[in-house]
Amino acid sequence: MPQRHIFLSAYGQTSFFSIQTYLAMSSIISYTLSTKRHTGIGLFLGLIPLCLQTLHADPLAFEKACLQAFKGEQLPEFSQNLTQLRKARLAQASRLPNPSVFYEQESARSTDAFNESSVGLSVNLDFIWKRGSRIKAAEQKNSASEFELSSKQLKVSYEIANMFIDYANWNKELKELGTSIKQHEEALTISRKLLVKGIISAFNLKRIELRMDELRFSYKELESNLAGLLAEFQLWVSEEEAIPANANLLYDISFETAEKAVEHALRNRPDLLAFEANSKWKAEEVKKYKNEKIPEVSLDISAKKYPGDNDGFFFGMSMEIPLGEKQGDVQFAESEKVSGTLEYKRAKRKVEREVKAAWQIWHHLQTDKNSSLGRSQMSEGKNYLQGLQSSFANGEASVIEYLDGLGSLLTGKQNTLKRHHLKQSAYLRLTYLSASTPSFSTPKI
C-alpha cells in the first residue's frame, strides 16, 4: 500500500528577512505612537545590522545540515577510526603464532666423545582450536561499535530536525504577533479619534497600550528564543549566519498500530542493537576463555648433529598446562555475559515503553480533527473582526469588545500553530524512537 505524503504548512511561507524586518519596523512604529515621540534616525539605523545579517543568511536544507552537523561532531573521523579499529581487532584475533627457531649445543666436560648440536623450529598449535572463537568475539564487538556510531548519527539527525520545525513554527508565531501588534496600533489610532470626539475616555487608550505592552513582551521573548535557536544551529553546522531552510516536514512514515512501531524499533534501533551485539560479544567471550583453558601444545622439529659423521632428526611435542594463569577468566566472562543479557532486556523494555507512549501521543494528535481552527473558521474570524473594527470606528462597539475580538483571533491562531507544532514534535519523536529517518521537502521560493 503506497504511503501518503502530508505536507505541514500553515498560513503560507514567509522568509526570515521579511518577518524580522516587518516586526522590527512594527516595534519602532508602535513605540513612537505609544510614547508620542519621534523615532529619530538612530532607531532607523538600528535596523541596518539586522537586515544585513538576514540578507547574508544561508538557508541549509535538512540533509546538508545533518551532514555538516556530523562533521561538527567529528562522526566521519569516528567512522574512519572505527574502520581501522575493526580491522585491527580482527587482525589481532586471527593472527597466527610466531614460530621460534632454536639452537642447542650439548657436550660433556673433558671429552669430545659426547658432543651434540641441534637446530630446530617450534610452532604453537593451539591456534587451530582457539582462533575461531577469538574471531567470533571480535566480530561481535565490531558490530556493537558500528551500532553505537549509528545511534550517534540518529541522535544528531533528531536534534537538527527539531531545530527545523522549531524555527519554522516560531517564525509563524512571530508573524501572527506582529500582525496583532499592528492591529492594536490601528485600534489605538481609532481610539484617539474617538477620544477627540468625546465618545470614549482616556482610560480606554491606556487599556490598549497595556495590551500592546503584553504583546511586545511576548514578541521579544519569542524573538530571544529564536535567536538562541539560531546560535545553537550555527554551532551545530559550524557555519556562521546559517539558518534552517523554510522546509515542510513530510508525514511519510505510517505505523497503523503501536505494536508495528515497536516491532520496527526492535529491528532497527541502533542503540538497542548495540546492547544486543554487546550481549552476544560477552557470550562469545565465555566460549573464548573456555577454549583458552585448553592446554597449549607446541610442535618441535629439529635436525641433530652427533659425534662423528652421524646426523639425526628430532620430532617432539610439548604441552603447557594452565593450572593457575587462567583461573577466574571464565567465571568473570560468565558474569559479564549475565550482565550483558540483563542490560539488553532492560533496554528492550525501555524501547517498548518509549515507542508505545510516543505512538499514542502521535495517534491522538493526528486523529483529533476538532482541536484547532480550520481555514473556513479563520476566514470567518477575520470577517467578524473586520465588521467589529467598523463598528468600533463608528463608536458602536466598545474598546473592550474590540480588544476581546483581537485577543480571541490571536489566541485561535496561536493555538492552531502550537497544536501544529505539537503534532510535528510528536511525529519526530516517534520517528526517532522507532529508528526512522524524517524527511523534509523544501518548497520553491
For each predicted feature, which ranges?
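N-terminal secretory signal peptides that target proteins for export/translocation
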Residues: 1-36
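Bacterial Sec-pathway N-terminal export signals of envelope proteins
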Residues: 55-105, 124-125, 133, 139, ...
